[in-house]
Amino acid sequence: MIQRAACFSPNSVEKDLAILAAVAERLQCKGHQVEMASEESLTAMGYDIILSMGRLPETLAWLQREQEQGARVVNTPEGISNCARSRLLSIMEHIGTPIPPQEGLDGYWLKRGDAAAQSKEDVVYVQDRESLRQAIVDMAQRGIREYTVSAHVKGDLVKFYGVCGTGFFRYYYPTDDGQTKFDDERWNGSAHHYSFDVQTLQGECERLAEAVGVEVYGGDAIVRNDGSFCLIDFNDWPSFSRCREEAAEAIASLIKIKM
């Protein structure tokens, strides 16, 4: 099991470690030998199954080599790479995932495009086009020249979590429990709990997960007041902090299927 490098766990290092530990505990209880490693200490050992939260380029290259040698990898290096925002947006557009429009009257979101967010500055809300242009300049000065832009969508912010092939899917309103990474939830305000079709959301998420190539996933959606929704974020192997024990059971079940 590969831990996620701290740079990819902003404000979430302990939570990310906790989900791996919970999965490891369940696999060990089933009689499996489990080893934990950091992204910085990987060596080729001929493992049968590798569970990885890693995102460093070196880690993905290592996973690719292990996969070519016959190891089963969750999530695959290809899938993890596809979660970089620019690639992800291209896949979403290709398969028709409901996403925010590029233009709107309620502000814009500028997001780092070459990798997952590593700091608060990688995901920025601005109120108008002039502010957007300056935010792009600021991001470029940090060495980031690949980015995505989308219009802000009003509605309930929903965080979702899933494990493909197990039926596991959960969603939560972060403003209900106050758990936050960068406090970006404030731009949508407290949840109104608009009614929407959960099965349709799950179906869209699983369809995207298949297209991206990840089996353990999470993300964010906005539910509008008419019940329609759009996906605004999708990522490989979240911390599952709101449903850790259930998620660990589901991930362990997924591994059993692969054995």
Provide a role label for each language-model segment.
Residues 47-51, 111, 160-162, 227-242:
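A short beta-strand motif that forms the metal-chelation/ATP-contact edge
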Residues 3, 7-101, 116:
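Conserved N-proximal alpha/beta basic substrate-recognition cap immediately N-terminal to
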Residues 37-39, 147-149, 158, 214-226:
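A short glycine-rich, hydrophobically flanked beta-strand micro-motif that places a catalytic Asp/Glu
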Residues 108-134, 138:
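Conserved anion/nucleotide-ligand pocket segment
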Residues 210-214, 223-259:
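C-terminal active-site "lid" helix and adjoining low-complexity regulatory extension at the edge
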Residues 126-212:
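Phosphate-binding site of ATP-dependent enzymes
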Residues 113, 152-153, 161, 220-222, ...:
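Anionic group-transfer/hydrolysis microenvironments
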Residues 56-57, 79-81, 115-116, 154-155, ...:
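Short, solvent-exposed loop/turn segments at secondary-structure junctions
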